[in-house]
UniProtKB/Swiss-Prot annotation:
Sample GO molecular function, one term: GTP binding
GO biological processes: selenocysteine incorporation
The organism of origin for this protein: Methanocaldococcus jannaschii (strain ATCC 43067 / DSM 2661 / JAL-1 / JCM 10045 / NBRC 100440) (Methanococcus jannaschii)
Name under which the protein is recorded: Uncharacterized protein MJ0325
SUPFAM superfamilies for this protein: Translation proteins
Amino acid sequence: MEGLTVGLFGHVEGVGKELGKKGTSTDITLYNYKQGDKAVCYVEPTRYPDRINPLIYEINMMDYALVFIDEITGELGETLLALDMFGINNGAFVVGEYVDLDMLKNIISQTSMKDFEILERDFINIREKMINLNIERDYNGFVKIPIDHYFTVRSVGTVILGKVESGTVRVHDNLRVYPTDKMAMVRSIQIHDNDFKEAKAGNRVGLALKGITTDELDRGMILSNGELKVAKEIEININWNPFMQKTVKEGENYQIIVGLQSVSCVVEEVNKNKIKLSLQKEIAYDVGDKLCLIDGSAKIRILGVGKL
């Protein structure tokens, strides 16, 4: 089974149900579409723009971005800024008939999205295009599965939902639940409600786990058989938001998002682009993962993005 995760951005009201069957829905909503041995999961940031977190989670979950634009509005600015600050260059704009294409091209000309394709709002064609997209995967590396949802199922026990970011996970694998020291065994694997003995990078999975309860889990925890870094204090070079109207100072409280982990933090030191943060709790990450510093209550919510 080949899997792809597509982020839906912009004017997405009513879009998900045109592209797939509605699945799990919390602050993000998943829509699933399957054709033969290929499956696409579309992610919609349901609670955005009220909350910034779903937008960042979606960016960190996806392989490909679809940005729907009915008209060029101010609200679109934060979404385009986030995609650019994360360096997203794999995606397409889906434009309505009244969108000024020259204006759009001008807006994105200096961004990571400058080479995005421009598509018409034809859902049949979009579905076909997405199901046939090829994404480079690491099937042989260590297993890495960030948890986006988890719950208890009677007679099954603890179940987590997530995307296999890398490697191949198999039934009976023992995986560490980062950032904790706890281990969990994979009892069973489901992909789109079908049982499998293994799942590879790109697949969205439901894993039944032995050895851990839902009380011990949090969104963003990572199942892995590799060596991830765990930290409660972080020094990082940040690319600051060019539209930010304030200076981040020592002693201030913010929030960071790394992968699907969201943690409060205090600024310990700031020296131009270099920042030292003390976190409320430990996070797990891989070298190269992105950290997003946010101020959820401010007008400009995304303060900066840096590479760990």
